[in-house]
């Protein structure tokens, strides 16, 4: 039943959604759940060398019933700054139940976003990290997905909110494009298909990301693309199937269009209907639009436009079916199949764009020409 409902939504047209019911506001996410953070200095065993080392800045969840923690995080080097604080790399520790040397180093890594409560209070009107935590916990229900960033632990103390996540060691996909200039089509397809799997998971959960971009795709050590940054996402409304009211994705019905909202996201990637902010929009369609822009940049090495507005001559050319002509003028031609896919995903009218299911069965996506698994850039970086 759930799979049938997903397929119906993944193939639904804008017209289908207009007939599903009146536009609605996004649904709220559930309340974020947090554990109590305990920060200690302790002895740690290196199981490879047998050495004991006293280390500082070990964080774990303090359970009310005082049962032993499941794991701990040895917080290490700074990876980057973020709006509310800093992101750091962590080493996962295993509890040994030994009073003298209570922890043991493992090969596991994590990243922690350390957010100041003071900063959260000051800037919550701009961006709400509590909502991002709620969304990530919602997305992670039922287990981690390989192509969407999930949550390991969410802890707090008097000063900080601590969001622990899987560690991605190879930077973001935008860095790969910058290094390469542009991708050969087999490499672009390799990444694009993984991004589509991430979108599929979000759609199955009834979530619109709203900020899809190459900068928001991290790459792990196994060359897996992971969608990150759910700070702007929306929980899509669905028809309740009975009274004409609004339900969530679990209703197994068609989703509704969403009432206009203030535009957000990175300018290159925002769809024209969201930029205008005058008419209802389809949450899934705007993510697919941004994904098409991502594919364009991977294949061409440049963004298609600054803003998807009539005033931009590049947008006007693509909107009128001239994508291939524009690329010939740039001396950046791509295959006819790739151009066909992009042209059909980047139609100005959302009623004419491809659905997720149509994108997945497009001949360019299904092409079996293959290609080598891409290599990471020469430096390691985690960007969240």
Predicted segments, located by residue:
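Terminal C-lobe "cap" of eukaryotic-type protein kinase domains
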Residues: 347-352, 356-372
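Juxta-kinase regulatory segment immediately upstream of eukaryotic protein kinase catalytic domains
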Residues: 2-68, 76
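Activation-segment/catalytic-loop signature of the eukaryotic protein kinase fold
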Residues: 154
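A conserved loop-to-beta-strand element in the N-lobe of protein kinase catalytic cores
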Residues: 149, 158-166, 174-175
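Catalytic-loop of the protein kinase fold
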Residues: 203-220
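Activation segment signature within eukaryotic-like protein kinase domains
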Residues: 191-192
């Amino acid at each position: 039943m759930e799979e049938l409902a997903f397929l119906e939504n993944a193939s639904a047209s804008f017209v289908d959604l207009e007939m599903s019911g009146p536009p609605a506001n996004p649904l709220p996410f559930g309340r974020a759940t947090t554990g109590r953070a305990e920060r200690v200095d302790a002895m740690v065993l290196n199981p490879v060398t047998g050495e004991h080392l006293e280390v500082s800045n070990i964080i774990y969840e303090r359970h009310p019933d005082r049962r032993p923690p499941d794991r701990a995080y040895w917080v290490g080097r700074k990876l980057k700054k973020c709006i509310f604080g800093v992101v750091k790399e962590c080493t996962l520790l295993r509890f040994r139940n030994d009073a003298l040397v209570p922890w043991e180093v493992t090969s596991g890594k994590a990243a922690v976003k350390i957010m100041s409560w003071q900063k959260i209070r000051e800037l919550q009107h701009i961006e709400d990290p509590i909502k991002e935590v709620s969304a990530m916990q919602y997305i992670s229900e039922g287990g981690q997905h390989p192509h969407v960033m999930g949550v390991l632990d969410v802890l707090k103390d008097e000063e900080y909110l601590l969001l622990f996540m899987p560690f991605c060691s190879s930077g973001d996909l935008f860095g790969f494009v910058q290094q390469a200039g542009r991708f050969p089509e087999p490499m672009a397809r390799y990444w694009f298909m993984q991004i589509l799997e991430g979108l599929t998971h979000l759609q199955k959960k009834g979530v619109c990301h709203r900020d899809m971009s190459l900068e928001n795709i991290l790459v792990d050590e196994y060359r897996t693309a992971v969608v990150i940054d759910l700070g702007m996402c929306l929980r899509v409304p669905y028809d309740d199937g009975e009274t004409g009211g609004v339900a969530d994705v679990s209703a197994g019905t068609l989703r509704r269009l969403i009432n206009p909202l203030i535009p957000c996201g990175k300018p290159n990637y925002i769809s024209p209907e969201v930029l205008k902010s005058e008419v209802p929009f389809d949450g899934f369609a705007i993510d697919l639009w941004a994904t098409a822009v991502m594919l364009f940049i991977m294949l061409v090495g440049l963004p298609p436009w600054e803003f998807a507005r009539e005033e931009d001559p590049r947008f006007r050319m693509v909107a009128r079916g001239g994508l291939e002509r524009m690329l010939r003028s740039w001396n950046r031609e791509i295959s006819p199949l790739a151009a066909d896919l992009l042209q059909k995903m980047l139609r100005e009218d959302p009623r004419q764009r491809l659905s997720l299911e149509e994108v997945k069965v497009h001949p360019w996506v299904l092409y079996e020409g293959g290609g080598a698994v891409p290599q990471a850039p020469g430096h390691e970086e985690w960007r969240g």
